[in-house]
Curated annotation (Swiss-Prot):
Name used for this protein in its record: Serine--tRNA ligase
Superkingdom of source: Bacteria
Residues the entry annotates as binding L-serine: 242-244, 296, 396
EC number: 6.1.1.11
Length: 435
């Protein structure tokens, strides 16, 4: 969440920055509530001071033997206490109302982020590789997988429903090989520590990384929700939409020594998403699933290091695509297409031949201190007493299913067989083709 000081001292400037990403900040309501809060805060402090002062007078009156005066002051103190209690209740209600508003406010965009309304306004930064040309009719990954029986959508529908997949044989092994290759690359060459984390997380974890309270409907929960979808019961466990949630929450409510930063962590997990807002989109194939695997990259840094860390983390995701020899492009998301908690995001989009377009395969984001403030994730500089908020970053390195789509379609041959990328062959027992 944003620093509350911005909503007090720099309200108009903050509203202008949020307007860049199409978020209409209700300045007048916030200003009115803040004025009431300040007035009530002063009243509460004055009542507290007066009650303390009058309480001392009770003892003084008793010392003088004036019990009648002592009783009168005692009654006065009782009335002051009741008035103070009511003022505290009202103040807490005002603070809660302000906090509710604050929770709904997205992060401020970095100055380098281009203005725009949606994905059409994202700006291409670079391209790598050249899409192949084929002298035969290109098949999509669904046809390629079903030809050999390696992808079984029908069984998945029977078992679970739409947007699920059953993989068999060499296709299942390829899926596993992709994830293992990514983990080995990130741990052995990029310096990340591999993590094994829970796939079910609590309310505080989802709040910390920003999925709650705003995006409760996008999650799968282990117990029924209340009538309002965003009001997830505090004891509910939810399936992770991304390993970003459990991995980033490793630093929740902790103070890290400066010397330990940056923290670089990676995890391979399944991810679960309801795709509530995606009805009718990408209904064919592996592009948009309720359950999919992903290798996640997370970095925890000092504030002054986070922008350089974003470039590094994005480069680590790019390296996967380069070693797999998959053509891709890198784009910077515009203000209207950024995620709720992001200050700056790069998307990597891989070439998908059957669609003749680039599709997102990784999003790499710098959250600044937006998540850290929610999580109270801090660090302490050497020689300093007061801790500071860390900056958090995350990115896909990569989405395993979409990587498999790209390999199947880009590496297809005329007979429907798939050439296995050289770097994956050791993970496939030396197999060079499947299908």
């Amino acid at each position: 969440m944003l620093d509350s000081k911005l909503l007090r001292a720099e309200l108009d400037e903050t509203a202008a920055k949020l307007a860049r990403r199409g978020f209409p900040l209700d300045v007048e309501t916030i200003r009115e509530l803040e004025e009431k809060r300040k007035s009530l805060q002063m009243k509460t402090e004055e009542l507290q001071a007066l009650r303390n002062s009058r309480s001392k007078s009770i003892g003084q009156a008793k010392a003088k033997g004036d019990h009648e005066e002592a009783e009168r002051i005692l009654a006065e103190v009782g009335n002051l206490g009741a008035e103070l209690d009511q003022a505290k209740v009202t103040l807490a209600e005002l603070q809660s109302e302000l906090e509710t508003i604050t929770m709904s406010i997205p992060n401020l965009p970095d100055a380098e982020v281009p203005d725009g309304k949606d994905e059409d306004d994202n700006v291409e930064v670079s391209r790598w590789g050249q899409p192949k040309t084929y002298d035969f009719e290109v098949k999509d990954h669904v046809d390629l997988g079903e030809m050999s029986g390696g992808l079984d959508f029908a069984s998945a529908v029977k078992i679970s429903g739409s947007r699920f997949i059953v993989m068999k044989g060499k296709f299942a092994r390829l899926h596993r090989a992709i994830a293992q290759f990514m983990l080995d690359l990130h741990t052995d060459e990029h310096g990340y520590t591999e993590m094994y984390v829970p796939y079910l997380v609590n309310h505080d974890s989802l709040y910390g990384t920003g999925q709650l309270p705003k995006f409760g409907e996008d999650l799968f929960h282990t117990s029924p929700l209340t009538e309002q979808v965003s009001d997830v019961p505090l004891k509910t466990l939810s399936l992770i939409p991304t390993a970003e949630v459990p991995v980033t929450n490793m630093v929740r409510d902790t103070i890290t020594d400066e010397a330990e930063l940056p923290l670089k962590m990676t995890a391979h997990t399944p991810c679960f998403r309801s795709e509530a807002g995606s009805y009718g989109r990408d209904t064919r194939g592996l592009i948009r699933m309720h359950q999919f695997d992903k290798v996640e990259l997370v970095q925890i840094t000092k504030p002054e290091d986070s922008m350089a860390a974003l470039e590094e983390l994005t480069g680590h995701a790019e390296k996967v695509l380069q070693l797999l020899e998959l053509p891709y492009r890198k784009v910077i998301l515009c203000t209207g297409d950024m995620g709720f908690g992001s200050a700056k995001t790069y998307d990597l989009e891989v070439w998908v031949p059957a669609q003749e377009t680039y599709r997102e395969i990784s999003s790499c984001s710098n959250m600044w201190d937006f998540q850290a403030r929610r999580m109270q994730a801090r660090f302490r500089r050497k020689g300093e007493k007061k801790p500071e908020l860390v900056h958090t970053l995350n990115g896909s390195g990569l989405a395993v299913g979409r990587t498999m789509v790209a390999i199947l379609e880009n590496n297809q041959e005329a007979d429907g067989r798939i050439a296995i990328p050289t770097v994956l062959q050791p993970y496939m027992g030396g197999v060079t083709h499947i299908g």
